[in-house]
């Protein structure tokens, strides 16, 4: 069961910044205490969270970018639940 509201607009948590780390070729979350390296799919999801687009819109954009990926919606929702639990998003 997913607890993320598809009509909600999410954004990065306070004090976090999403950036690209060219030396490691990955997205990273920067915060006052350090850095979190993200896998590619986490970076793609987080870069779409602008505080205005709904979760449903983010999923639609990802589905357009990556057509025919089975379980994409469920995977995105599961990731967002984890990200919210870690206070990466609000």
UniProtKB/Swiss-Prot annotation:
Signal peptide from the UniProt entry: none
Q: In which pathway does it act?
A: Cofactor biosynthesis; pyrroloquinoline quinone biosynthesis
Q: Name one Pfam family in it.
A: PqqD
Sorted UniProt keywords: PQQ biosynthesis
User: Which Gene Ontology molecular-function terms are recorded?
Assistant: quinone binding
Presence of keyword Zinc: no
GO biological process terms, alphabetically, are: pyrroloquinoline quinone biosynthetic process
Q: List the disulfide bonds.
A: none
Q: Which InterPro entries match?
A: PQQD (IPR008792), PqqD_bac (IPR022479), PqqD_sf (IPR041881)
Q: Which domain of life is it from?
A: Bacteria
Q: Can the keyword GTP-binding be found in this entry's annotation?
A: no
Give the record's subunit note: Monomer. Interacts with PqqE.
The job of this chain, per UniProt, is described as:
Functions as a PqqA binding protein and presents PqqA to PqqE, in the pyrroloquinoline quinone (PQQ) biosynthetic pathway.
Family, similarity comment: Belongs to the PqqD family.
Family annotation (HAMAP family):
PQQ_syn_PqqD (MF_00655)
Name the chain's protein: PqqA binding protein 2
Organism annotation: Pseudomonas putida (strain ATCC 47054 / DSM 6125 / CFBP 8728 / NCIMB 11950 / KT2440)
Q: What is the lineage of its organism?
A: Bacteria, Pseudomonadati, Pseudomonadota, Gammaproteobacteria, Pseudomonadales
